[in-house]
Structures are given as C-alpha cells and as structure tokens.
C-alpha cells in the first residue's frame, strides 16, 4: 500500500515512537490536546483508517486483520523501523490486540485504553434487556447505514454536538477538516462495516498465537461514573451495574495476557480516558520510556 493512501500526521521528535489507533468513528483531531503534551518526549504517529477522513475508501472488508495489515504497510512506507509503543482506544484497542499477534516483533509495548475485549460477546449474554436495545451491534450497523444515506447538511445537524466540542481545541483550518470528517457518507458506511465484523475479529484474535510477552498497560474507566452515565440515558441501575462489572472483568482479563502488564483504573474518567485523564496516560507512557 502506498503511504499516501492513508491520512496520517507525524508530530514531535522525541526518542520514543508512539502510534495511536483511534476508537470506532473517532478522528485523530480528538487526540491533539494530549499529543501537545507528549510531543517533547515522543514521535507520535496519528492516522485515519481506510474510510475515515482523507484516507482512501476501503478496498477490503473492515476486519481488525485487514486494519492491522494496512497500519503495518503505512508504518513501513513512512519509515518506522524501530520498535514502537502502540496505543489503542475502545475498538482501536481491539485492532491493537490483532496487530500485536500479527507483528509482535515490531512492538516495544502496548497501551489499551478502555479497550474493546476479544471476549466482548460476554456482555451480550447478561440479563440487560433495556441496555441491549441501546448497544446491540445490529442497531449500531443499521444506524450508521441510515446515516450514510443522509445529506451532508443532515449529517452536520446530526453530529453538531460532536463537531462543536472541538471549538477552541483546534485551529480553524482543522475545524473545517473535522466538519468534513463527521459529515462523510463513507465514514458512516465504514463504521457499519467495522461493527459488522466484530464477531469475526473476536474469533481471529482468539485463534491466533499467544499474546507477546511485552510491557502492557491496560487502563479501565471508572465504574461508578460509568454507571451514573448509563442511568442518565435511562438504563436501569441494575443493568448498568451488571454491564459495568463485566466490562471491568474484561479489562482485567486483557491485563492478564502479558506477564509484564500493569492494570490502572482511571478514577473520574468515562470511556474517553484520553480526554478525561490525560495525566494518567502521560504518566504511564513516561514509565515505559524511563
């Protein structure tokens, strides 16, 4: 794959290379505030997966296997030769798990930020009927397919809260790119395709070789805060507690795949740990390179 097929940015000139894999539907502009604080000590690679931003349209199914392969091609094309730290958030963390099993020799360490688990299906086996209507994979797929058919103006209105949250955080030029990002029909089509393949992704990751025994940091969200957020969305407290307890168990399970792991609870943070607790992530990364 030619390097210009995927949109990327290299920021900083620090001695450690840090590659960031964003969550599903997320842009790398989200990461600018924390990247500003990291660029003195790290060379940071941000990129948009195929179908996101200015990257090419997907040419293969949106599986974590294909995503990992495409990331590897990009890193080779831009000349990343030394071992690097790979950090992933949410679904991006699932992509990181896949990459780690496919290219273990290329990694210095891994950071998983409230990552989707390879055993995510256990969440759907819980007795949480109301929440299942809210988080069902088929609902996510259907919703994004519907969004992909809307006009740009309709998508701008639909995503106005997301877009406006970037105000005063990035430049005016980048604000134009953010609006383009979230009003893209291809973005929503790609998100639907990524969700569609979660079952395949889970099986692939579990069927592959053992996880590499390299330093691993797993950061999990604050259970009490997450439960409160679910209740604010009219999810019954009992269901929210069941779900969040299982999510925490899955995070701990992720930390057990390497004997060189550290498990951290991000007190006061919801799912977007990199926005809520950047200090915690910065400290964790500094431990890795010290």
Indicate residue ranges for each PLM-predicted region.
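Alpha/beta-hydrolase active-site loop signature
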Residues: 25, 49-53, 92, 117, ...
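Conserved serine/cysteine hydrolase catalytic core
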Residues: 170-265
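Active-site loop/oxyanion-hole signature of alpha/beta-hydrolase fold enzymes
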Residues: 49-87, 91, 103-106, 129
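Conserved hydrolase catalytic core segment
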Residues: 82-125
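Conserved HGGG/HGGXW glycine-rich cap/lid loop of the alpha/beta-hydrolase fold
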Residues: 7-54, 74, 102
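Catalytic active-site module of serine/aspartate enzymes centered on a nucleophile-bearing elbow/loop
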Residues: 249, 257-290
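Alpha/beta-hydrolase
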Residues: 20-21, 47-49, 113, 220, ...
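Flexible "cap/lid" loop of the alpha/beta hydrolase fold
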Residues: 111-148
């Amino acid at each position: 794959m030619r390097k210009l097929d995927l949109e990327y940015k290299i920021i900083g000139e620090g001695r450690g290379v840090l590659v960031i894999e964003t969550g599903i539907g997320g842009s790398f502009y989200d990461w600018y505030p924390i990247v500003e604080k990291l660029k003195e000590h790290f060379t940071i690679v941000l990129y948009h997966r195929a179908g996101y931003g200015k990257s090419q349209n997907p040419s293969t199914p949106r599986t974590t296997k294909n995503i990992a392969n495409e990331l590897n091609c990009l890193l080779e094309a831009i000349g990343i030769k030394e071992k690097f730290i790979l950090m992933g958030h949410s679904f991006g963390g699932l992509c990181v798990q896949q990459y780690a099993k496919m290219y273990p020799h290329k990694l210095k360490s891994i950071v998983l930020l409230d990552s989707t688990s390879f055993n995510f299906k256990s969440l759907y086996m819980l007795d949480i009927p109301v929440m299942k209507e809210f988080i069902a994979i088929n609902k996510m797929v259907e919703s994004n397919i519907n969004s992909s058919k809307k006009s740009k103006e309709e998508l701008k209105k639909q995503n106005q809260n997301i877009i406006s949250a970037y105000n005063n955080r990035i430049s005016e030029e980048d604000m134009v790119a953010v609006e383009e990002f979230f009003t893209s029909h291809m973005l929503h089509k790609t998100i639907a395709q990524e969700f569609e393949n979660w079952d395949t992704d889970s099986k692939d990751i579990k069927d592959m070789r053992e996880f590499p025994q390299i330093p691993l940091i797993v950061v999990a969200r604050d259970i009490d805060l997450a439960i409160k957020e679910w209740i604010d969305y009219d999810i019954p407290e009992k269901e929210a507690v069941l779900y969040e307890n299982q999510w925490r168990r899955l995070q701990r399970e992720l930390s057990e795949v390497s004997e060189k792991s550290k498990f951290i609870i991000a007190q006061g943070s919801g799912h977007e740990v990199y926005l809520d607790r950047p200090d915690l992530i910065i400290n964790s990364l500094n431990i890795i390179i010290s």
